[in-house]
Amino acid sequence: MQSSTAHPSRLALYARLVRIDKPIGTLLLLWPTLWAMWMAADGHPPPALVAIFVVGTVLMRSAGCAINDWADRDFDKHVKRTRERPLTAGLIAPWEALAVAAVLALVAFTLILPLNALTKWLSVAAVLIAGTYPFFKRFFAIPQAYLGIAFGFGIPMAYAAVQDQVPAPAWLMLAANVLWAIAYDTAYAMVDRDDDLLIGIQTSAITFGRFDVAAIMLCYAGFFGIMAWVGHALALGAAYWIGLAAAAALAGYYYTLLRTRDRMQCFFVFRHNNWFGACVFVGAALAYALR
């Protein structure tokens, strides 16, 4: 028993690498995909298609974690929250992280082989965006915007899979997701801001400085403006607007926590955005179900 504790199995280390024990990233990636799928299919997406996208989301988020740890391995050792990650701690080799990411991405791609060509081409773009995101922290002042594209690329893919096209509402939702990602990931970046300043990487929390909370709330406001337009364009019913109102109430609650700039409160806000995304989805799903 002691040996097992001291020397985790390779499988256990790979599970830690891809954050199996931390599903929040998967959920933040999944909600926008589900919003889009329900809207693209008028509330009745094929169950098999939903399953493909749910499993694909889990796989690609896991692959993204492995790539991120490989790219950030020299930075993570200087950050208290990340220095014990398997790759940073030297428990696995860099090539293993790349191999895990490649296998997961390949399995995810096999899931969409039955789908149309547009979806497949968009999946290639999604992989390129996910794979390059970690490097944007080296030079881009607000890498969270690029993260929002990566985490929202399930939106055009869902529309492509259902309609074989990507209409204006899909691109608007992607823009809304970028704003949402800046909001919740800036809260996350506020946790590590002091460490990030020391090691010299870029984050929105550093860029916004003392206007960090104001910027977060402005992003939430922009999100609601765009999603209100989408709801109007798609003639969604009262349930959708109730869902948006519930999400807005959560955003107001987040403000009361973020203004303290307490690290634990900021981390709580980041994690709690799962419920923000859920409110939007439940509202949209009910709006279609009640038609």
From Swiss-Prot:
Membrane-spanning segments: 23-43, 47-67, 98-118, 139-159, 171-191, 216-236, 238-258, 267-287
Membrane topology note: Multi-pass membrane protein
GO molecular function: 4-hydroxybenzoate polyprenyltransferase activity
Keyword Chaperone: no
GO biological process: ubiquinone biosynthetic process
Cited function: Catalyzes the prenylation of para-hydroxybenzoate (PHB) with an all-trans polyprenyl group. Mediates the second step in the final reaction sequence of ubiquinone-8 (UQ-8) biosynthesis, which is the condensation of the polyisoprenoid side chain with PHB, generating the first membrane-bound Q intermediate 3-octaprenyl-4-hydroxybenzoate.
Entry's family note: Belongs to the UbiA prenyltransferase family.
Principal cellular location given in the protein's record: membrane
Catalytic activity: all-trans-octaprenyl diphosphate + 4-hydroxybenzoate = 4-hydroxy-3-(all-trans-octaprenyl)benzoate + diphosphate
Encoding gene, per UniProt annotation: ubiA
EC code(s) of this entry: 2.5.1.39
Annotated organism of origin: Ralstonia nicotianae (strain ATCC BAA-1114 / GMI1000)
UniProt KW Cell inner membrane keyword: yes
Name under which the protein is recorded: 4-hydroxybenzoate octaprenyltransferase
Pfam families per record: UbiA (PF01040)
Assigned keywords, A-Z: Cell inner membrane, Cell membrane, Magnesium, Membrane, Transferase, Transmembrane, Transmembrane helix, Ubiquinone biosynthesis
Subcellular location: Cell inner membrane
InterPro entries (alphabetical): HB_polyprenyltransferase-like (IPR006370), Prenyltransferase (IPR039653), UbiA_prenyltransferase (IPR000537), UbiA_prenylTrfase_CS (IPR030470), UbiA_sf (IPR044878)
GO terms under cellular component: plasma membrane
